[in-house]
């Protein structure tokens, strides 16, 4: 499927090239440089559910006229663009063709590109929970759910406390673009943790067959210390058990060396 280019942009490009290639005035000693940009832009929301087409006409880095499909007609951005906007708006054929570019150009190109390129790319998010301040229970705090490295941008992140969705005190950053086309976002929950409460960050994304849920449990410092001590004790126990088995195994084999001299006679 070939990509389409807005027809009026193409026509305008030919005119600009003719003007820029005109011979210089005889006797002129210095070159004059002109830059004309003709930009056709397509904006998509939820795939092709909503499409916006924008054509921009720029001369020496200054936009002079624009067509926006949400407006439905050409609008002059500067006085330089007023004659062109008025003329193009007076031509039903031009106006109808440009309005149709939402489908003939934007939708057409989206469907072609989606079939063959990274628009079908899916990257699963990584999810982690952190506490903004290390404080005791029953003090105001903020839980941060970090959702990173996902594609496409569409994502839904929710907070739950003991199985009930939290809507008060929830805020988030804007989507942050990574250099590899993936995204990340932080979703915060203002809360006051109490002993035994379970907070869950619930993430839904097109790349996932089922949502990702990550839990954070409210614990006192003493409970956390006991848990860490228990884990440390288990690790040390496994190490000493392994060391003891190794020593016992070596001692059962006995020392290696030449047989007693009497056995050789």
UniProtKB/Swiss-Prot annotation:
Pfam families reported in the protein's UniProt record: C1-set, MHC_II_beta
Region of interest called Beta-1, as start-end residue ranges on this chain: 28-122
Biological processes, Gene Ontology terms: adaptive immune response; antigen processing and presentation; antigen processing and presentation of exogenous peptide antigen via MHC class II; antigen processing and presentation of peptide antigen; immune response
Signal peptide: 1-27
Keyword Glycoprotein appears in the UniProt entry: yes
Single GO cellular component term: multivesicular body
Keywords, ordered alphabetically: Adaptive immunity, Disulfide bond, Glycoprotein, Immunity, Membrane, MHC II, Signal, Transmembrane, Transmembrane helix, Ubl conjugation
Extracellular topological segments: 28-227
Recorded topology in the membrane: Single-pass type I membrane protein
Alphabetized CDD domains for the sequence: IgC1_MHC_II_beta_HLA-DQ_I-A
Family, as annotated: Belongs to the MHC class II family.
Record's protein name: H-2 class II histocompatibility antigen, A-Q beta chain
